Amino acid sequence: MDDMATMIGGLSGFLDDKDIVTDRDDMAPFLTDWRGIFTGSAQAIVFPRSTEQVSALMAYAQTHNINIVPQGGNTGLVGGAIPDNTGSSVILSLSRMTAIRDFSEANNSMTVEAGCILQELHAYAEERGLYFPLNLAAKGSCTIGGNLATNAGGVNVVRYGNTRDLCLGLEVVLLGGRVMNLLTPLRKDNTGYDLKNLFIGSEGTLGIITAASMKLFALPKARSTALVGVPDIETAVTLLGKLQAASGDSVEAFELMPATLLKVVFKQFPDIPCPLTPLPEFMVLMEIASTNASDGQPNETGQIPIAETMEAFLADGFDAGQISDATLARNDIQRQQLWDIREHSPEATKRESTPVNTDVSVTRSQLQTFYDLAEKEVHKIHPTARVCAYGHLGDGNLHFNLIEADGGDPDWSEKRGALFEAIYRALAMVDGSISAEHGIGQMKVEQLKGVKDPVALDVMTTIKALFDPTGILNPGKVITTQD
């Protein structure tokens, strides 16, 4: 639609004026991703407050051929929620759709709207004695709609799975305004094609997720957290298997961090204490949890059972020469101090440099091989690049990130593209994935064409054309009808 005033006037037919933003300064925070890599432009940002308003917008967009870019908390890392620079898009922010429509203790589920902040869902469930385990560094800003759109992972995937695994049902608004109600909390529903999972991870390119039914779990009442030094990734993988067996498969987190990353974290955040000195080659942050309150209380010998389990595991690791050093959190303050190291890792690398960030996954058995290959390939391109990888070892998801040499490097910006290619070359050697939990967005569209099975890519193109024949739903993301 060429006439801006006419377009805005049309939006006012089903949205309040206060829910339509066109001022450039007011729109600015929504037009750039949090890392400052992607910046776009838009005609307006709209903030619907109901599924009915989203439906009206989607009908209006189809009639007038308006590009729609859905956005949640704008915490994405691949530019999936940022429009292009044509200025032809309207950003659809779900941030004002925050109702919790249903909470069922009997069914262990809650039905929530797409704009609900993840951390607020944690609190809501815990206040009622249940647990929503999806846990990301961006939990204070990201929305459940965005988590679903990207099939987000996080630190608890090893026990509870990705967002897809936590979702029971969806409400989705299709282009043209039809509302598809798959919003059932049923645990079993074998009535035809699994359309729900088609939209999870589709990044708003097939329809707009407006609400979801999500699984809840028994609230963990006892935890034991340790930070452990290991010589290499292969040893860490071995320890994961041992901890799963020792704890009765109750490992909630198993996070890998190399010494190069840790040096940057402690440099950029000097108030965070360094618990292991000298720094080992790798540290693993590991946590086990129990829903049994007695596991966190002194037994007849005065010992805490869950801490005893962790201590016995650590002792076995020391005896086997697999663990070089370790610290065990004895209270919630110490636990948070250990988690602060991991949770500050993304911001630390951002402060230190303009990082080359990746989100790859490989089988656990290939993690060491991939790490070594990628490091070798990277140093062929840029010998002084620092590998600041971290990730969720339990599910094979590694953020193999790079930063420039300490003190800066004038060639860094020029070589970023070649560094990405070096990492992806190593990834191809171990049959890994270029996206584990961040999605494709606009950053990885071309890479996807090069690595996806051609038949699968053709099927994806057909599905996209079916739901969005004119290519106006989050254009330029994941795949387009022109591919």
Locate predicted features.
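Noncatalytic alpha-helical scaffold of FAD-dependent oxidoreductases
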Residues: 1-483
